Amino acid sequence: MEEANNKESPYISSILPGWFSEISPLWPGEAHSLKVEKILFQGKSDYQNVMVFQSSTYGKVLILDGVIQLTERDECAYQEMITHLPLCSIPNPKKVLVIGGGDGGVLREVSRHSSVEQIDICEIDKMVIDVSKQFFPNVAIGYEDPRVKLHVGDGVAFLKFVAEGTYDAVIVDSSDPIGPAQELFEKPFFESVARALRPGGVVCTQAESIWLHMHIIEDIVANCRQIFKGSVNYAWTTVPTYPSGVIGFMLCSTEGPAVDFKNPINPVDADDSHTKTRGPLKFYNSEIHSASFCLPSFAKRVIESKGK
């Protein structure tokens, strides 16, 4: 693994020396900056540039291709919500597939559910896994669960070999729809996910920001309504270091036993047996679960129009 060196990163701002600035065509005309105390790692995998730095205010930060993936301070808001929104909406999930999520945070959260017997994870970039284990052990702790089976490879290709109806839940923890994650936002991928789910199975996928990406969200909603014949919903949460400070999730179910995503029936926050090894939940609870489906009027109009 390539270690940090004194070579200046292209993502360290030349306008504000010593600050990391997140600049992307996905959010033109704006940037979010964090003060850098020390660059801990820089490397280039077969798929993307990887960087870790110590920030002044958010702890250690993981960057992929110039975009913040997680910080120690606020990763809980994303990891807990993308995991427990789907898993708390169905009774006794047993088989779970995670696509992406190489940092291990979703695995950490899935492992809180005692009913789960099998956790498969398919991550394309081994460097992300190795870097997360080295610099974010409290996140990557999920890999230590004996129920976890790691598959290093392309999630799209992995799904093609999954038997129909294998999983109770699929969680797609992808980066933004450019580069290696682009296929994870396209219709053929969602069709593969639906085939891999049992009747009444659920999927939760990262679905961008209502403030920045309504055009992308519209396409995702339209595709999901064509493919998933159960329930299709959009939820959101707040993550301060993500662009616009919020991130959304598509939650869908296949035809079969009805799933009411807005009313959790399998509350993980009612059982504290998992806290000894995973620590207490920092963000998720049953009340915020239901509240996350309440959308601002402008977003509600657009998303509901795609169901007509």
Curated annotation (Swiss-Prot):
Lineage, opening ranks: Eukaryota, Viridiplantae, Streptophyta, Embryophyta, Tracheophyta
The protein's name in its UniProt record: Spermidine synthase 1
Biological process per Gene Ontology, one example term: spermidine biosynthetic process
Reaction equation(s) it catalyzes: S-adenosyl 3-(methylsulfanyl)propylamine + putrescine = S-methyl-5'-thioadenosine + spermidine + H(+)
Principal EC category: transferase
Pathway of action: Amine and polyamine biosynthesis; spermidine biosynthesis; spermidine from putrescine: step 1/1
Pfam family, one: Spermine_synt_N
One GO MF term attached to the UniProt entry: spermidine synthase activity
